[in-house]
C-alpha cells in the first residue's frame, strides 16, 4: 500500500509506519523501541516499550519492562509539529540497592499501571528522519512486595503507592517507513 498524502504545504508523505527509540532511556542503559502508525491524517497510534535487564555489582538492580500505548491527535497533520496524546502504562519491576526513591537498603518487586496526557513536538530532519520531544503527566498505581536489599533478603511485606506527576519524558529519533 502506498503512503497517504499529506495536506498542502508539507514536503513529506504520511508514513505507513514509524520506528523510534528514546535517547533518554539509552542514557540509563534501558533498551527501548516504539512503533507509530496512522489511524487518520491527524490521528496516530503509538506503542512504546522499554526493558532494563541488568543487575550490577552487589546485586544492585533497576530491572523493569514496560508497555505504553498512546493515541495522538496532531494539530496540523500526522508526524509533524505539535500533538496531544492520551496513554496507558503497564510495567513490571525488580529494583533495589540503588540510591533512588528510598531503595538504597530495600528491594521492591511488583507492577505499576496508570494513564496520562502527553504533549509533544516533532521536527523533520530529513526525508525519513525526525526528532520528537514529549512529556506527559498522569496517575500511576504501584503494587509491590518489599524485601531487605541483599541476595535472598528477608521479606518485609506488601505495599502500594499512588502517584500523580510525570509519566513520560522523551527525546526520540524516528524513522519513517513509507
Locations of regions flagged by a protein language model:
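Cleavable N-terminal export/targeting peptides
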Residues: 1-12, 177-178
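Extracytoplasmic loops and strand-loop junctions of Gram-negative outer membrane beta-barrel proteins
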Residues: 15-18, 53, 99-104, 152-158
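Transmembrane beta-barrel architecture of outer-membrane proteins
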Residues: 16-18, 28-30, 64-68, 112-116, ...
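Gram-negative (and chloroplast) outer-membrane scaffold detector with strong preference
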Residues: 37-133, 174-175
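Internal, hydrophobic beta-strand segments that form the core of beta-sheet-rich folds
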Residues: 133-139
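A short acidic/glycine-rich loop-to-helix N-cap element
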Residues: 144-146, 153-162
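Outer-membrane beta-barrel "beta-signal"
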Residues: 163-178
Amino acid at each position: 500500500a502506498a503512503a497517504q498524502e499529506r495536506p498542502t504545504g508539507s514536503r513529506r508523505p504520511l508514513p505507513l509506519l514509524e520506528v523510534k527509540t528514546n535517547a533518554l532511556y539509552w542514557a540509563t542503559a534501558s533498551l527501548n523501541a516504539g512503533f507509530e502508525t496512522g489511524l487518520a491524517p491527524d490521528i496516530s497510534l503509538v506503542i512504546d516499550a522499554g526493558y532494563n535487564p541488568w543487575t550490577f555489582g552487589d546485586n544492585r538492580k533497576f530491572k523493569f519492562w514496560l508497555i505504553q500505548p498512546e493515541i495522538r491527535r496532531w494539530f496540523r497533520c500526522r508526524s509533524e509539529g505539535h500533538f496531544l496524546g492520551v496513554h496507558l502504562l503497564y510495567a513490571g519491576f525488580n529494583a533495589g540497592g540503588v540510591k533512588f526513591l528510598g531503595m538504597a537498603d530495600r528491594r521492591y518487586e511488583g507492577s505499576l499501571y496508570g494513564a496520562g496526557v502527553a504533549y509533544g513536538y516533532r521536527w523533520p530532519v530529513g526525508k525519513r528522519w525526525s526528532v520528537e520531544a514529549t512529556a506527559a503527566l498522569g496517575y500511576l498505581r504501584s503494587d509491590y512486595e518489599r524485601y531487605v536489599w541483599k541476595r535472598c533478603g528477608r521479606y518485609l511485606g506488601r505495599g502500594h503507592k499512588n502517584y500523580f506527576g510525570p509519566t513520560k519524558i522523551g527525546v526520540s529519533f524516528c524513522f519513517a517507513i513509507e
